[in-house]
């Protein structure tokens, strides 16, 4: 094989966005080693600049002629580009919200940025990986970096406990996933590329070993997306971990898990489509019900948002279960919307904890009287998570539920509507507590609420992150047509889709034979 032919097959430009992040994390690490704590003044901005460059490079890769790189191991198609952009955006907002948090804790910002960028690179590679070894290495890169970030506050016993729990359960999940991949490798006759595995398994009967491999793979993916009953780690890890880490895990890590689910399940298990859809139907039902019901009883904002994220994962799984192009498009769109409204909520929680040192829901009582802007911001994000119009979360759920209804998943859609109403209750409860008007109803924490100051290091990035997420949460739904065009284009090459993309304008369509009312979104 000559050099030119090898270079064309490697097609290294497909991973250029990840390459920029790798260079950035090396520079951040070297800066922290060389300059110590003084590097905190510029390392976050270097990381932000590299993420902005990464997003631009992803934009330039859209609809590229040859998206396959590294001898077929990596696919930079439009679907992977959208998921990688979601992860890069979540990391960018996480950095904006974390600078002041890490600075106030007394920890090293450079080390934190290095580990966070490492997790981002692993997650982005996972979105496009099409070879078993690359899938596993990418997943482990993301997982190990996540363990390190979870226990980053070394002097906090809760952070250490969360890291240990996450490590033990995550290690078991990785072992199960690896065993599932090994079965897939053996049954396919030693193939490692997903397309080759699918081709080798085309004539294979639904053997017990193949079903076991499917179950093991789904169990590991479910752990990554925090689906019930593989969610036990989520509340404890979310409560004990640094809040910026929780924000990244709730969006970036979850998006990578769903990207892996789409690519692995639709390509590597051609004979078991009905089986994995049935399993994910059960997971979606359990996640929507348990996540939203248990969230009602929580007294900590971080634990409430943890169970909320479990319920949100159940909603997203509706798009995965129905297996249509409209389902995948609505799933990707909802993840994009979820990024802004969830990170916006966590930004508000961080800002409140920086000023008060607590995240208990009861301590938010009367916040409106002392900090009306923070109250408004958190209220908008929570209402959007609940799906209240005209905020972005409403349109995300509308597209998702309509795709499910079109595909005939009436039970899942109705359950999703019911559990959405349940979620509104615990979101409204927090808002109601914040807007009490009587001074005697204020919590002791709010009575001693400090004056609002934006001058300390890291407060301006936090302010920028909050404004960005609020603008997106408020307008992304109303101005959704460009986003829908992007997500519809991104799923055009997804295998096994069964129906057309989501329409792009609201209309009443009446067919000559069968009258139907279909909102074209």
From Swiss-Prot:
It comes from Acaryochloris marina (strain MBIC 11017). It is a multi-pass membrane protein. The chain crosses the membrane at residues 15-35, 42-62, 79-99, 109-126, 131-153, 167-187, 208-228, 242-262, 276-296, 304-324, 332-352, 376-396, 398-418, 464-484. GO terms for biological process: ATP synthesis coupled electron transport; photosynthesis, light reaction. GO terms for cellular component: plasma membrane-derived thylakoid membrane. NDH-1 can be composed of about 15 different subunits; different subcomplexes with different compositions have been identified which probably have different functions. Keywords: Membrane, NAD, NADP, Plastoquinone, Quinone, Thylakoid, Translocase, Transmembrane, Transmembrane helix, Transport. NDH-1 shuttles electrons from an unknown electron donor, via FMN and iron-sulfur (Fe-S) centers, to quinones in the respiratory and/or the photosynthetic chain. The immediate electron acceptor for the enzyme in this species is believed to be plastoquinone. Couples the redox reaction to proton translocation, and thus conserves the redox energy in a proton gradient. Cyanobacterial NDH-1 also plays a role in inorganic carbon-concentration. GO terms for molecular function: NADH dehydrogenase (ubiquinone) activity; quinone binding. Coiled coil: none annotated. The lineage of its organism: Bacteria, Bacillati, Cyanobacteriota, Cyanophyceae, Acaryochloridales. It is found in: Cellular thylakoid membrane. This is NAD(P)H-quinone oxidoreductase subunit 2.
